Amino acid sequence: MSSDLWNKAQAVFAGGVNSPVRAAVKPFPFYTRSAKGAYLVTEDSRRLIDFVLGYGPLILGHAHPKVIEAVKDQLERGWLYGTPSRAEVELASMITKHVPSAQKVRFVNSGTEATMTALRLSRGFTGRSKILKFDGNYHGAHDYVLIDAGSAASEFGVPFSQGIPTEVSSTVLVCPYNDLTCVETVLKREEIAGVIVEPVMGNMGVIPPEKDFLPGLRKLTREYGSVLIFDEVITGFRLGLGGAQSYFGVTPDLTTLGKIIGGGFPIGAVCGRKEIMDQLTPSGRVFNAGTFNANPISMTAGIATIQELEKKEVYTVSERAARVLAEEIDRAIKMDHVVNRVYNFFQFFLGVKDVRNANDARKAKRDLYVKVHESLLKEGVFIPPSQFEALFTSGAHDDDVVNESARVFKKVLEDLT
């Protein structure tokens, strides 16, 4: 039972969990026994419709048969070589085919490693030391980005983590999202190595870029000689095969990827312009290495996933599911609210009229959102326990799943709002 496991977990894990957002489910997290398609099955034998999907990677749904088949085959042939493999070349070739900025690729093991490497690359390439990021953008759990961070950092009240030296934090400057005036002021005043941004904010709920924001970043970074980094760990291969940069028509210098490109297995990647990527060791002097970089299991799962995405049906199904549910939620909420959706992921904010940056998102009625989450969970629908995460849909969220979910959302939201 989940309650028994929670009691044991608190004795062996800090805070009882291995990633803080998992502790946001109250009174204690449920524990998952298995998952298939759009559903989770808990240790308490409850079947839940899942709109978390591992926080984004599972765009095909849980336990997709093509991914299972590919990974089983790879397991029979070994799962770690310490040498290059055919699979890593194939997956990188898929990425360079579809992602506009990706002339070369370096695989790592997480989104955190990807952004850490991208920032190091921007510093090595430009010879500058300072970074510009945006309030509420989350780029992983390393020192240079845990400053005004979103996601669980904001949920648990620590957007500035303890343990980061001032010598590090002093090299990171922050602007509000969607604020080009601030960006230009900083770029004029400081020697900025890299500007890192979530092209769609996915870690303060969902907040889309305003029309001129991404093109403006592209123009300003070129003008002032800074490296533009799109953190597409969430949006990469979610908003289409080319990610946010294709969706919005703006090509950065570097892109970080993760989540979907590993098919639900641990992965990260940095890709971008040849002259920047070639600064990485062994061709350059910006160091990166890893025992599990490009491990065959993640490579194989990623290939199988992208092969399914290339058929386009997954995008059609997942976009329709998100659109229908976002519209149903919008109709059902009676109080002031915002529903922000970009293609196949979305979030709703209660008690506010406009959400265009992190400060706006923080004004939403988070306590009421938690009550909605708890009521939905009782009715068999699992959404993120944090206001500052996103709801994701997949190719497994078919009409039957959408119709049942819409019924539950309508019932809960009309009752609570």
Swiss-Prot record:
E.C. no: 5.4.3.8
GO molecular function, one term: glutamate-1-semialdehyde 2,1-aminomutase activity
BP terms from Gene Ontology: protoporphyrinogen IX biosynthetic process
Domain of life: Archaea
Keyword tags: Cytoplasm, Isomerase, Porphyrin biosynthesis, Pyridoxal phosphate
Catalysed reactions, semicolon-separated: (S)-4-amino-5-oxopentanoate = 5-aminolevulinate
GO CC terms: cytoplasm
Modified residues (N6-(pyridoxal phosphate)lysine): 259
Protein name: Glutamate-1-semialdehyde 2,1-aminomutase
Designated gene of the protein: hemL
